[in-house]
Amino acid sequence: MEAKVRPSRRSRAQRDRGRRREAARDARAQSPSSGDEPEPSPGKENAGLRGAPPRGAAPAPRTARPPRRRRRESSSQEEEVIDGFAIASFSTLEALEKDMALKPHERKEKWERRLIKKPRESETCPPAEPSENRRPLEAGSPGQDLEPACDGARKVPLQPSKQMKVTVSKGGDRDSDDDSVLEATSSRDPLSDSSAHAVSGRGYSCDSESGPDDKASVGSEKLFAPGTDKGPALEKSEAKAGPVPKVSGLERSRELSAESFLPTASPAPHAAPCPGPPPGSRANPLVKKEPPAPHRHTPQPPPPQPRGLLPTHVPASLGAFAGHSQAAANGLHGLSRSSSAPLGLGKHVSLSPHGPGPHLSTSHLALRSQAQHQLHAAMFAAPPTLPPPPALPASSLVLPGHPADHELLRQELNTRFLVQSAERPGASLGPGALLRAEFHQHQHTHQHTHQHTHQHQHTFAPFPAGLPPTPPAAPPPFDKYAPKLDSPYFRHSSVSFFPSFPPAIPGLPTLLPHPGPFGSLQGAFQPKVSDPYRAVVKVSTCWEGPWQGRTLVPPGRPRGARDSRSLQKTWVGVAPAPLSASILSQKPGRWCAVHVQIAWQIYRHQQKIKEMQLDPHKLEVGAKLDLFGRPPAPGVFAGFHYPQDLARPLFPSTGAAHPASNPFGPSAHPGSFLPTGPLTDPFSRPSTFGGLGSLSSHAFGGLGSHALAPGGSIFAPKEGSSVHGLPSPHEAWNRLHRAPPSFPAPPPWPKSVDAERVSALTNHDREPDNGKEEQERDLLEKTRLLSRASPATPAGHPVSGLLLRAQSELGRSGAPAEREAEPRVKESRSPAKEEAAKMPARASPPHSKAAPGDVKVKEERGEDEASEPPAGGLHPAPLQLGLGRERLGAPGFAWEPFRGLELPRRAFPAAAPAPGSAALLEPPERPYRDREPHGYSPERLRGELERARAPHLPPAAPALDGALLPSLGALHFPRLSPAALHNGLLARTPPAAAALGAPPPLVTAAGPPTPPGPPRSRTTPLGGLGPGEARDYSPSRNPPEVEAR
């Protein structure tokens, strides 16, 4: 086809050049590419100009391949002299590599020899000869070469015909191309070299199926640069007319663009060498050369190959450029199928406007690609419009074509073939645009192109657990992300956008930044890869880039442009192993935040369920909660947070008797903690945090959780959370409290109620053990209520507010309220709750610190002692908090986040130093065991916590804060420290507590890094009283507790 197209496009100069080339090629037919001596035209055919020496046996294979490539064979085999540039095509990578092996000067010498011989032979040989040898190796010949280069493997057609040989030359494309190019221009030697090297070596010789597809670009740069090609071209008769044809070339570019489609489309008789070189046939000679090789495109009869110097030269300059462009297009398509059309178009179309710039090649490629694709669209199965995109990517990306890339390119081309034909009928720039679209947003990128829209469909395919249900939920929003994520920049970001949860599936900080659509967690703690697999693969792929690393993307493709289709196909066709859901994982790095979140939640839930099965006490309070607690974005997916309701069922199921469990949503507990609805909101997180109780261990991508929940791994925390998950509700609260260190303040109150309920239930569970404790706690609660009631406790402080609120509740409830508070304490059984009580005590130092406080502390301490053997309140706190760290930290808060937080804040510093990770871990175990028998009685837990606090309290409020904060705060660290929790929510202890909240807990949990400062801050803000007062209360409690201990 191209042969015919070429005759149309080819100018007389080109035909002459082609003849000379053919003559030269005949002369150097023996070693076309390296062949210093032209081979007989058949020999050339066999050896292929460039490809022959490198390919050696390529000619025969080419003969075998031509059938498919014949259509594009026109330009596949030879080194096309397009716009005076020799574009070498290689039938095989081997030929290309051989040629590449030649050093530039060697290659140049070869080319020069060829050029010398070519001019002689070209002049000597009639166009037919050249057509037979290389089809007149004119512009068309290079096109053929290019095409053969692209088709190298395919275009073995018509070895007998020289033209075919150009096609056949595919393997020895370089030969024909180089001959043509070198003949056409001495510049072409370097260019040919470059072209052969880039195009053949990396160029689009094999572009279609070889791997070097995208190489056109490589050659293109050099090809485009040389106007010198014309020198050799001038050497040829047509070379002299070269300058004129540049305009002609432009005209022809368009002309041939049109012609290309037709002529290229019509296969020309392979044997039909350019008969006479009629002047009108300058394009025809182009095609004509190809005609000998049957073209897929146009059965244009090979027109006489006029030696249109114009076309020849334009092609030399532009043509070579276009040749590369063409090669790129062909190579990109790796189809070489449209090689003939691209050759004609490439030569001429490329000639005109883009002759000068290598990038023009891309444009030319687009033009030529269009023609080429239109001609070979069927061949590539890409719509005619589609061709331009491949062409563009080919030219732009073709450059890098590496052998390794060839495989990828081939795959990509295949993918493209599929996708192009189906997907992008009319986007010549589609690839770039698509690529961008693919890159575009999705994961701020996620995967270069894995982002294309199909990416989200994979949503959570890779995600382990229950992702299937949720993944689809967010894909639409993330669609935009997925594509962008595809971009190298972004792909990795999600590289995926929301790498957060799925990657951290196990401990991903569901609690921290719920990905929601855009969980902050994603960026903050987690690699932005929602899907670790995709993110990693895509990142590696993406970062390697379409340019090189991208396994799926042809190296030669521009990163963002034109890769889209390529990438899309690549990803789809070549889904990287890591992206088994690759096509899913078109946005590998970025799953939709929601999908990730849901997947994570599902996974977590499953894990929790498993743990619950293993350890009923774990009672995955957050099992469902996690699902919902995990919903990352507070406001993003309020509904997701409602699943906390599911969590509630979990809670109820977990702590069947723990109203707080259900309360999660409706009750005054985490769900209530924050508005039940709000829980879904930012505070949905708290609910989430309920899930985060277990997430707290996962907070920060499981960072905080594991570290924070020394007692339990991510799941251990859940376990501890459920176990000492005081009541499940407490666990929910734990999650809430520690999960949303900033959120806990509000929920704590509802939690108080819920906690009380739960604590009542739990107390019933524990009442035998805790009867005394309850009584004592009642006293404590009364004292606390009084303290709370006392105005001393600043209402401004969230804790104060909590206490006041609790007071109101207690006051309203009277003894029952006290009992509720008592249960709360029991529930909290954590310094947090006691601290809350202490806060009221602080508020009313006399009353609080009075015997009642002591009694409370002491009694609770006794309970703690009984309940929690571990000495050092920190252990109980760690028990709750250590477990709470995973999730129990919240339980301490669960009863009353503020009180718990307060205590933890104060105790956190002391506790941090005192408890240490080991201490926290140990007590959680024991409290967990103790609790198990007690059914996680909130009171028992509270007692344990208080016991834990007792030692901490002796250190004073700071000790208590340290103790509790390390366990509560540190445990809550996943989210925030209790202080941070309260500060954020209550702003009670601002920076110190807040700072303590998130970062300090890590340290605090490990040691007493922040105890000194935060405790004071907490003490003052929490108590709303002076640190001394707060400490007074806690110390008063602490000493008795210590005594009890």
From Swiss-Prot:
Crosslink site: Glycyl lysine isopeptide (Lys-Gly) (interchain with G-Cter in SUMO2): 858
Bias type Basic residues, positions: 1-12, 443-457
GO molecular function: RNA binding
Modified residues (Phosphoserine): 340, 790, 937, 977
Modified residues (Phosphothreonine): 989, 1010
Pfam families: Auts2 (PF15336)
Record field: compositional bias (Low complexity): 48-63, 910-922
Region (Disordered): 1-86, 99-315, 443-462, 719-753, 809-880, 910-961, 991-1045
Bias (Polar residues) ranges: 183-197
Residue stretches of biased makeup (Basic and acidic residues): 13-28, 99-123, 817-837, 923-949, 1029-1045
Residue ranges, compositional bias (Pro residues): 270-280, 741-750, 998-1015
Protein keywords: Isopeptide bond, Phosphoprotein, Ubl conjugation
The keyword Iron-sulfur is assigned to this record: no
Family: Belongs to the AUTS2 family.
Protein name: Fibrosin-1-like protein
